[in-house]
């Protein structure tokens, strides 16, 4: 724990009654909340958005906000403020979201619709160059020959932030809280922490332009935020290379790492600037197939919390 950010009491009010969903602290950490839409809410939402296939959401971006409003209305307009409050709360900033009745791989389109509705209650999802849409779906199989760790099943995908190789700031990711990282102060105060570094993506990301930014910056209250991924940062010299290697080791060996099971149909929604995320290895199996979905974007309802190069 670093001295800059004290963990506040959990903001979840056990006596609070919500309409259309429940909210409890997760078993893994009081920072991570579990939000579950009731069976009735899920059923009514899917019925009311049935007229729009996923393709309609891809082609008409305003419909993404429409389905968000439908979901919020079904929750007596308590959902949107709760999402924003949680994600912008430094002591939390993460939700594991579940909808009763959406739990089968055959419901992939329903999962995209629900995730789209939730994401567009807090902002807007960025264009994903890898898929050519506002979201990406990709498959992890037992054998993989891709050019990044994203689809490789039998190795750990190290902790990282999303959006490091694009120019847009990525506020949220729909998929380790840095305040729980015991080495944060050491690396945040290092002279290289604020040096702009080059981030370059492999061909599969369909992003040809390199971007430059530091690994660390601060939010409006001077607290650390990160934009980091070990695979795409390109050190220019020995000093940067050694520091980045030590930084990676310090993150991956942290005692503050959480392991959060995400069953079919559930998704994580996190503040991308002060949570890192990764993925553990899958157990080898000839028939291994897991399809994953992501959305990442920016908050549209608050002054930006990222202060560049301060």
Swiss-Prot record:
InterPro entries documented for this protein: GlaH, TauD-like_sf
Annotated residues for binding of Fe cation: 160, 162, 277
Cofactor requirements of the protein: Fe(2+)
Entry GO MF terms: ferrous iron binding; glutarate dioxygenase activity; oxidoreductase activity, acting on paired donors, with incorporation or reduction of molecular oxygen, with 2-oxoglutarate as one donor, and the other dehydrogenated
Cross-referenced HAMAP family: glutarate_hydroxylase
Role played: Acts as an alpha-ketoglutarate-dependent dioxygenase catalyzing hydroxylation of glutarate (GA) to L-2-hydroxyglutarate (L2HG). Functions in a L-lysine degradation pathway that proceeds via cadaverine, glutarate and L-2-hydroxyglutarate.
Homology family: Belongs to the glutarate hydroxylase family.
Protein's UniProt name: Glutarate 2-hydroxylase
Lineage: Bacteria, Pseudomonadati, Pseudomonadota, Gammaproteobacteria, Enterobacterales
Encoding gene per record: glaH
């Amino acid at each position: 724990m670093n001295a800059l950010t004290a963990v506040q009491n959990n903001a979840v009010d056990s006596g609070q009654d919500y309409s259309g969903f429940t909210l409890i602290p997760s078993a893994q950490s009081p920072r991570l909340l579990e939000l579950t839409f009731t069976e009735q809410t899920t059923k009514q939402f899917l019925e009311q958005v049935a007229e729009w296939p996923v393709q309609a959401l891809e082609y008409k971006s305003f419909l993404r906000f429409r389905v968000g409003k439908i979901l919020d209305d079904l929750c007596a307009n308590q959902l949107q403020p709760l999402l924003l409050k949680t994600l912008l709360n430094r002591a939390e900033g993460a939700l594991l979201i579940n909808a009763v009745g959406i739990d089968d791989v055959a419901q992939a389109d329903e999962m995209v619709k629900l995730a789209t509705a939730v994401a567009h209650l807090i902002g807007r999802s960025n264009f994903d160059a890898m898929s050519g849409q506002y979201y990406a779906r990709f498959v992890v199989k037992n054998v993989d020959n891709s050019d990044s760790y994203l689809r490789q099943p039998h190795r750990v995908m190290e902790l990282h932030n999303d959006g490091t190789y694009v120019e847009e700031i990525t506020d949220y990711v729909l998929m380790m809280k840095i305040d729980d990282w015991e080495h944060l102060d050491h690396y945040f105060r290092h002279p290289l922490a604020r040096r702009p570094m080059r981030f370059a993506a492999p061909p599969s990301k369909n992003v040809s332009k390199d971007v430059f930014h530091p690994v660390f910056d601060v939010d409006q209250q001077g607290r650390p935020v990160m934009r980091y991924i070990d695979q795409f940062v390109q050190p220019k010299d020995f000093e940067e290379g050694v520091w980045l290697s030590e930084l990676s080791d310090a993150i991956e060996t942290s005692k503050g790492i959480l392991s959060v099971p995400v069953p079919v149909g559930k998704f994580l929604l996190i503040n991308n600037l002060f949570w890192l995320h990764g993925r553990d290895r899958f157990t080898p199996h000839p028939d291994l197939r897991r399809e994953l979905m992501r959305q990442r974007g920016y908050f549209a309802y608050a002054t930006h919390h990222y202060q560049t190069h301060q």
